[in-house]
Amino acid sequence: MNRKKISRPLYYQLSLVLVFCVASIAAISQVKISGKVTGADGKGVPLISVVVSNTSFGGVTDGEGNYSFNADLKPGPYTLEFTGVGFKSQTQSLTVGSESAYTANVSIVEDALNLDEVIITGTNVRTTKKQLGNSISTINSKQLENTGASNLTAILNGRVMGAQVTQNSGDPAGGISIKLRGVGSVFGSSEPLYIIDGVIVDNSSANVINLNADAQGARIQTGANRLVDINPNDIDRIEVINGAAAAAIYGSRASNGVVQIFTKRGRVGKAKVSLFTSLNFNSLRNRLEMNTVPFRFGIPGDARLTTTGDRLTTIANLTGTAGTGPAALGGRLIEAKYPVTRYDYQDDIFDNSKGTDNHLSVSGGTDKGTYYVSASYLKNDGIIRNTNFQRYGLNVRGDINVTKWAKVTAGALYTNSTSKDLPNGNNFFSPISTMTIIDNVWNINERDANGNLLAVEQVRMNPLSVIETYDLRTETNRSVADLKLNLTPIRGLNIDLTNGFDTYSQTGNTYQARIPYPAVSAAFFPDGYVSYARYNYFQWTFDGVASYKFNLLKDLQSTSSAGYSAQYIKTTYAAQEGRDLIPIVRTIGAAQNLFTLPVDNRTQQSIFGYFFQQTFGYKNKLFLTAAGRFDGSSAFGEDAQNIFYPKASLSYNLSDEDFWSSSNFSSWFNTLKLRASYGKAGNLTGVGPYDRFISYLPITYTGGGFGPRNSIGNEDIRPEIKTEFEAGADMQFFKGRLGLQFSLYNQEITDLILPFNIAASNGATSLVDNIGEMTNKGFELMITGTPVKNNDFRWDASLLYNKNDNEVTRLYKNAGFIGLDATGTQGVLEGYPVGVYYINYYARNADGSLLLRDVNGFKLPQVERGDAATNIPARDANGQPSGTPLRQVFGDPNPDYTATFVNEFSYKNLSLRIQLDRVAGFEVYNWDWITRNNVGNGKLAERELNGEVPRGWVAAIGGFIGPRIQEEHVQDGTFTKLREVALTYTLNKLKFAESMKVSLIGRNLISWDNYVGFDPEINASGQSVIRGNDFGAFPIPRVFQISLTTNF
Amino acid sequence: MKKILNIFLSSVLLIGVGCKKEYRNPNAPTQEDVFSSTDGMTRVIVGIKNRFAVNTLGAASIYQAISASGLSTKELVVQNAGNADLAQLENGGNNLAPNNGVIGSLWSTTNIVNSEAQKLINGSANVGDVNLKNAIRIYGHLYKAMALGTMAAFWEKVPLNNGENAEYSTRIEALTLAVQLLDQASTLLGTTTIPASFTSQVGAEIDLKNTLLALSARYNMMLLNNDAAIAKASAVDLTKKSTFFYNNVNPNPVFRSGVTTANVYGIRTDFGLSGALLPDANDKRRTFHLVKNTANGSGFFQNDATAIPIYQPGEMLLIQAEANARKSQLATAKTFLDQVLQKTAAQDAFGVGAELPPYSGPLTQADLLQEIYKNRCVELYLSGMKLEDSRRFNRPAPGAAGAERTRNFYPYPQQERDGNTNTPADPAI
């Protein structure tokens, strides 16, 4: 038999690995069970799994809907379970007697809501959506296909209720952040917990490059989020639970929700080989409009405009003045203009680029065990020249049925990811920022006789210096492995033991060449800069869950679970920076000036918890679950460990009641499930392992010292507690053609942790402490429908809508505004969402028009002033603003709602999928806009040159004639994006292959927005809590991809 | 079957590993670690010195004192109008907002120095060895006095001791306490043999004996205690140097974060002086302070490694000149002034020498004081003392004709006011 030929060597290998667990198998009579599964149309349904209940025997239907497997069963009554994605599960009883072969044919019906979909997330006991009192989103492998996204995180976009997925950067190695139901923490991460095959995996973004880049104190986390190491082609399904309900099972680490990822595994049957290959083409989607007026204010100093007087002519008159400071600015701005050539630097910075993604997998198995192996290679070049991302991956998984009651599954995933980067935003030596901070009047392509680039504006850098001579690299080696033992020693008892680890080593090297031209600010490292950094991460997960399911009464089923989980996390981080480089060498050895101390930082942390959960199910329609959990983390003091977190949930499948089926509406209103849940969770990773201590920094000064820090800890700090209530319903109409799911939720976060500014007379300036309360209230809705469906043509549509209101409801200790970034532009203010822009604004007349003031004969805008204590504006005798500049809230970076509208059309073997995303009601702080106009390359500067606004208008807004009017810099980011269009054609039963699929996919094709920048979605702070920060971030490219999937 | 059981059991045993509930931080000591041993406290002395002198853990006291005083008294000029905080100081008056970053960090770092120095004083009580006990206490006194003296140069009221809702005292009380602390330390030093190993650990580049005297002279002068100022200043051995030292890792903050960037601030021509105060064209101190190297460095800010003096010999001479002049001992005052004017670079411990003829102006108190002030402006250029000097010598105040400074005193930082109900009212100017 073919099957044995293929399975033997693998079985042999797995046996070697797991030799210790091979046990003798009691010989019981072997029977063959086979049959056919058909749909409502009478056609066979493929990929339906058939399992003998409470045993490990089973199989999967083939392309015609037929299945067949052998099982070692004692004579007696059994139940066969038929389950499959998109279908209602079905059971059929089977009595094993003396015969050796049995046939069971069933017909199954479609289920748009997948209420009978088997869910693993939430309990290790397999359960169905039907039983859950909380909302859960699932993404199956079919939905994972036909997407041009190479980062797993991007795939969740538009497929998960309550999720806001943001691509923070268009860098091929850039990151993506996800928030489930809004911001859950400010000091800690707001990202959900990621679990791959039962093992918790890290998704952080360590900075191993860009060590010198955060000029703004914006807590940048700009690299890739580490889920980029996981190849989406290896994913079988994803389950997402949004709220604190997840935490009752996964522990408090899941207080921001949990994303559980299951990788592909082999299926019983002959070996299947699948090959995926694709090519993608990237280009800049949106070009900035730059100043095109061929004049400039001022008097040219020299032909190359390199004198002091040629700086910043939009905002300052620097000609013939000794200093260049505000004293000079106080003078009249030059109104004279001189002719210049204006350039569009975008031509020099951006380039079209290509990429490729390849994946090969082999899988198969027998009733004794299955296997899945895959290898992959991805390379993608960025649209900013000299950037790329590359990933090699290897994935192995085996499932073995050791005995009738014991299963072992083991898997390992290895990835090598490398990237070539350039400095991200938040400084003036990134590719975008170097272009933003100079007027577009210099020919940046000019070179001297030696081929060296020439200087541009004094102090600044030529953008091409960054692109051509910088060399930034990262390399990550990662492996995630798991070993899971599943025991079903007696009927109804299920024990799962999972051991696994996630470990990676991430190295970053930065080389910024010496700048060959003079007068570049020392802050931009004109003498060259080099750094290396290494981050090692190790996380070990243990989970043990036992559950027992039995019928308490005839109609009352009881499931009891108890479990223990523990994680141990160890990190090491080492880094060194240097400047003043000798030539040729590009590593740290080139540095003649090691201006920072070598960094060697190690942490260890343990997180532990145990839980008990009890579910009662009444007639398979009413389910009540209650659970309790104790959790602790070594990051907190002894008194704050072992906190009790309760949970309760209720699910009522009203449509299973007799009155429903006998009613006349049941013909079109088929399913109604009501659900409600309540849960509490503490954020165990809300503070770093040692943040609670007052610690001194070891310094190299004199004979070595302990430096007192500005920030101190509180040893009695407690975990942030999130209490969440959610209620919702799942409905199905017209025989599954229309589905409607919604949830309402209310999260209350108490003891919110923040670094709180204290009076320096305390002896420190900030204290990390429990400082406030925050809520997230929201509404999630998903409508799925199939408006048209006939033999050849099918139209599926879905609408996802998530609304979330975040508010910091209380700050303890009378805390006022707490700035999150160093500039204090955005932060936390009682009564407002996290990250509000609390800023200076225009002084206005009573009728709302701008209150202008006379500056050298020009009427210019100015900031509102008044009494800072009361925030009430004041006017002097002349009716002009007086007092200190006042601040007000102007927007925040959290969207009011996000929505995704997907339409999928299929005609025979051709299908078309169109995804539209809308993110509405959020604001971006447009630093680049300020800079572009201040230096003269922006469109407002152009208007001033054209005389459409008075001379000095830009300077007045930009903060050079009076304080900066920040209100003008906050811009609406609302956008609707044509996120993805995928056209797919499938060919079946070819001579050389079982099937072949060709896809043409476009991503990020069009954005409808009013934002004056590359893209309102990007965030220069990356995955940081600082959002809406547009300071030189890489724009997201438009991508066209052609892919070919062949199944052999 | 047995083997499966073994897996199960070993898994359960592994749980034990994850159960450790407390991990010590291998990267940094806690406050308890630090103040429970002599060695820990010795290293905090270095840490405090670092906070006062180096920008590693936040803007250093000396950096922001030089920056703020320099910008408020026209010693420095802002290089990029985009540096709003610096521009506020340069423009002064109502432009200086309480949330100004420069005065904010000057305030916070100096308060931290005060707080940590007090912890040293308190912690020294638990040290057994009397020499070490005294040594730690002396350094505690020194840095607390420096913190109080620095704050008193910029604010009208100062918290003498740190804590929640700290109470404020007048700057006179702060300076008085600073003088007491320094004089007590001097007395204590007389009866203490500081172990050589201790000195080398905390830094021999600070000559303790003379620094205590020099600072006492400085703060007595600020208090206009003329006799005490003369007594202390005259006791200082002018051949000895006391400095904050720098290197690549601990760079000279005024050089690295200030002048070399060409984008923060720079020195002014003629020390920012004009009119009657315009220094003589032949004044050799012009060369010392005003000639910039290719990295924009000059004076005590030539490069990353240039040491900044804690006091200069010239200051001690000028204190004696000033105190005598204030006492109307004009002839004596002139002798000290002439010592400064005639001093050659070679004669000065730091190479600061005017090499000018002796004072030949009218021998009146007012004229002498003006010449002394002018020489302080030149000799002690960018030492962070000019705002205090400008006030003490009654130079034209902000708003007055020919104003030479843009503020008299600074407003209290916003963060201080938000967190301390005892924060006094801001000065009008």
At which residue positions do the language-model features occur?
Chain B
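Membrane-proximal, proline-rich intrinsically disordered regions
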Residues: C19-A68, R395-I429
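Conserved, well-structured interaction surfaces
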Residues: T42, I48, G82-W155, N165-I172, ...
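Hydrophobic-face positions in mid-chain alpha helices that act as interaction patches
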Residues: A81-E90, L224-L317, T344-Y359, Q365, ...
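Aromatic-residue-lined binding/catalytic grooves and analogous aromatic/hydrophobic interfacial grooves
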Residues: K20, V179-G190, K209-F244
